[in-house]
């Protein structure tokens, strides 16, 4: 029997809580909002990690910097990555003088069944995000979910329902929301320092391409069938998809997992980096609860670039930034402009300048966004990148890819 994504969600996310919270694909996916008591966890919050690649390692290092958090468990379909993860986290805690013995679970389901784990980091490939996140929410866990939040628009609607009907906290891994430079740029836009915003330029890269990698030998200890889940069977293994590692001698991944660049397995740069930049753009102009009203692919209706149009008149395009040439966002208003990336900040008005403090280390290891998640777990109030925002950002990204694929403009009908 062929597996589609809707049936996949229903069959993989239901068991642990007894009742499935998924419903029909209608509206914006909001369910009844239920809240738990403040700080039901005690002094230490126990965290498990699912999907143990490069991104998860960086994110987890950020979580180890939070004093009331302990990473206690992990799961992955690749055994060597489990071993590497355990060794890395145990070593970090040992240097802090903290006893640690991270448990490896045979599956994410087994990890979620442990009532002593309060929250999970989910950093799998995109096509597993929704199913595992919904299972975690049903199991009573709070969730830190890597971006892009979901693989499809439908999944985002169902994830909103799961969060709200279970009364859980979900933080999307859009770390730029907790970055002081991006926060400053957003504040300047929202305070009208640039006047009325007329145009946004966001640089993040191209949509995905069809899967065309040749087959290579499967590394020992990788369960490729489980990795695939609902994906087409013709997506055979290639070293770039889940890069093999070595523990002795130590050999890291030779690249980021290439699944993100192919339309069968990911959303290309549009969702990979667009999830960051579109998120900041929509936040700044007050559209992160609504999204665009029209998306136009390059070469259609006179559009030179992939274009998003908002009902407040703002036009956003995916194109190179004039000053920095890095992935980032440029806001152009009646009174001037601001251009911000993860390393640079430029503006036409020196009074609006922001000077970055270089703290060293990998960008993803900075703990501010993870601290925001933990703070929300304790307060039971929404974090700064909640599920609805993640859904609207993902929707804008996916609409960009759909418009590119069908080669005509897409307009919102409500």
What kind of region is each of these model predictions?
Residues 64, 87-91, 164, 190, ...:
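Sec-exported extracytoplasmic/periplasmic mature domains
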Residues 147, 192, 380:
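Conserved G/P- and acidic residue-centered "switch" motifs that form tight phosphate/ATP-binding loops
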Residues 184, 196, 201-388, 392-414:
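Contiguous beta-strand/loop segments that form the cofactor/metal-binding neighborhood of enzyme cores
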């Amino acid at each position: 029997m062929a597996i589609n994504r809707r049936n996949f969600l229903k069959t993989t996310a239901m068991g642990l809580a007894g009742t499935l919270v998924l419903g029909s694909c209608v509206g914006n996916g909001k369910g009844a909002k239920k809240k738990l008591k403040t700080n039901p966890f005690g002094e230490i919050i126990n965290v498990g990690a699912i999907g143990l690649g490069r991104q998860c390692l960086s994110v987890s290092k950020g979580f180890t910097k939070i004093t009331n958090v302990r990473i206690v468990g992990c799961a992955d379909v690749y055994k060597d990555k489990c071993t590497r993860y355990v060794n890395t986290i145990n070593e970090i805690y040992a240097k802090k003088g903290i006893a640690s013995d991270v448990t490896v679970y045979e599956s994410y389901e087994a990890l979620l069944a442990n009532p002593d784990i309060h929250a999970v980091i989910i950093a799998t490939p995109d096509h597993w995000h929704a199913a595992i996140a919904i299972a975690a929410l049903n199991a009573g866990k709070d969730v830190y979910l890597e971006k892009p939040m979901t693989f499809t628009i439908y999944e985002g609607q169902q994830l909103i329902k799961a969060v709200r009907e279970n009364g859980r906290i979900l933080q999307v891994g859009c770390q730029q929301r907790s970055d002081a430079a991006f926060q400053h740029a957003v504040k300047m836009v929202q305070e009208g320092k640039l006047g009325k915003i007329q145009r946004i330029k966001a640089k993040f890269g191209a949509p995905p391409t069809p899967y065309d990698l040749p087959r290579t030998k499967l590394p020992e200890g990788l369960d490729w069938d489980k990795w695939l889940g609902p994906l087409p069977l013709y997506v055979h293994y290639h070293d770039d998809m889940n890069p093999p590692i070595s523990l002795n001698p130590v050999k890291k991944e030779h690249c980021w997992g290439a699944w993100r660049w192919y339309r069968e397995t990911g959303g290309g740069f549009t969702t990979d980096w667009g999830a960051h930049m579109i998120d900041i753009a929509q936040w700044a102009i007050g559209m992160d609860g609504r999204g665009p009203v029209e998306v136009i692919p390059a070469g259609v209706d006179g559009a030179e670039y992939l274009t998003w149009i908002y009902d407040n008149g703002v036009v956003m395009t995916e194109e190179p930034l004039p000053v920095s040439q890095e992935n980032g966002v440029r806001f152009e208003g009646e009174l001037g402009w601001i251009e911000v990336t993860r390393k640079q900040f430029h503006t036409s008005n020196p009074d609006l300048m922001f000077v970055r403090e270089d703290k060293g280390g990998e960008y993803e290891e900075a703990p501010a966004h993870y601290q925001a998640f933990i703070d929300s777990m304790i307060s039971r109030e929404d974090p700064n990148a909640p599920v609805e925002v993640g859904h609207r950002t993902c929707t804008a990204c996916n609409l960009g890819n759909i418009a590119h694929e069908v080669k005509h403009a897409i307009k919102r009908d409500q």
